[in-house]
Amino acid sequence: QGWQPAERTLGIVGVGHVGSLVKAYAEGWGFRVVCCDPPREERERCGFRPLEEVAREADILTFHTPLDASTRHMAGSRLFGRMKSGAVLINSSRGEVVDGEALLRSGLGWALDVWEHEPNPDPALLENALLATPHIAGYSEQGKANATAMSVASLARRFGLPLDGWYPPQAAPAVPRPISWQELCRTIGGAYDIAAESRRLKERPGDFESMRDHYAYRREYF
């Protein structure tokens, strides 16, 4: 889009592990960041904002929420009507968090990794996405290793197995590191060409599930 962080407001919906990392990096890059996380706000009173306020101020609105009765279609026509003209919505949480039909009518831009009706995303939603990927945001080497380690830890607790701290030996845990906006823009394309990934999915939408099943894991970039 040619945007610079200092000129833009990033809205984050869901400030758990991933959302917190997004917040930390975005603030470091110079974005103005506004956050919404009602469960955390109720528990911690940490100054998070209501969803509609965040949506109204955001140039980019990104979702990092679980899917339950309270989040299904939380991004729908009412919310879209409060967003800025030309704003961009990003969803890498669960497809049903966003009402796809309403998004098509919204006039917004969107970048989606998750979709309603997977593995058969709406053709118009797919074709008109700024970026489209086949639900692979967590498909890094470390992401898969973390999920495996969590499963092992859960089984170990359930059955009393001596596996505290176990982690797949083939994968080194990712350690977040500072990275400037300039370095990110200059180098990330060499680590992961998301534009090429998006083109492949748009050209061959019927391969959605196959692309996931045969995805080559990448190391986390930062």
Q: How would you describe each model-predicted region?
A:
Residues 86, 92-222:
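Rossmann-like dinucleotide-binding domain for NAD(H)/NADP(H)
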Residues 27-45:
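NAD(P)-binding Rossmann-fold cofactor-contacting core
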Residues 19-20:
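N-terminal Rossmann-fold NAD(P) dinucleotide-binding loop
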